[in-house]
């Protein structure tokens, strides 16, 4: 999955063409992730995946400060590239402000422990066919993923990480 350029339409198109379409969902809150999974299912009967991050060390949310960064705050140049790519390829752009947190937003702050846990709950509840951990160890969620028949992949950068994921 290519976070920022990924969409249900792109993932479904790749799967329908015989590849494995993957939703790059690192910055998707749980509501948006559930919506994307369901939209993808409406467009394909083929297997598809979801790719998120599971960092080992991450902060807990400070619920008194609900002003965590949004995807648009993180890397503006990357977002500009993704928007240009999506326009060129005829893909639907996110609604302006759709990635901004509202004052009454009860979703976990972006890139907190609660955020990643909520994403994994959605992935398990929605019985996603393939899950890819772009960072970190999906071990704590393997029971739920296996119970669903979800195929699990983990991207690792070192032998020691592969050993951690294997166990």
Predicted regions and their residues:
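Active-site entrance/lid segments in N-terminal catalytic domains of soluble metabolic enzymes
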Residues: 1-167
């Amino acid at each position: 999955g290519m976070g920022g350029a990924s969409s249900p339409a792109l993932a479904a198109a790749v799967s329908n063409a015989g590849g494995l379409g993957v939703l790059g969902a690192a910055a998707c809150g749980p509501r948006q992730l559930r919506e994307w999974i369901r939209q993808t299912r409406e467009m394909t009967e083929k297997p598809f995946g979801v790719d998120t991050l599971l960092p080992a060390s991450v902060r807990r949310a400070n619920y008194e400060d609900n002003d965590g960064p949004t995807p648009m705050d993180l890397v503006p140049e990357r977002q500009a590239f993704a928007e240009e790519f999506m326009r060129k390829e005829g893909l639907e752009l996110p609604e302006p402000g759709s990635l901004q947190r509202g004052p009454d937003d009860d979703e976990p702050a972006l890139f907190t422990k609660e955020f990643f846990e909520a994403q994994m709950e959605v992935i398990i509840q929605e019985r996603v066919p393939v899950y890819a951990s772009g960072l970190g160890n999906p071990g704590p969620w393997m029971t739920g993923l296996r119970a669903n028949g979800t195929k699990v992949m983990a991207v690792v950068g070192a032998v020691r990480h592969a050993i951690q994921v294997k166990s």
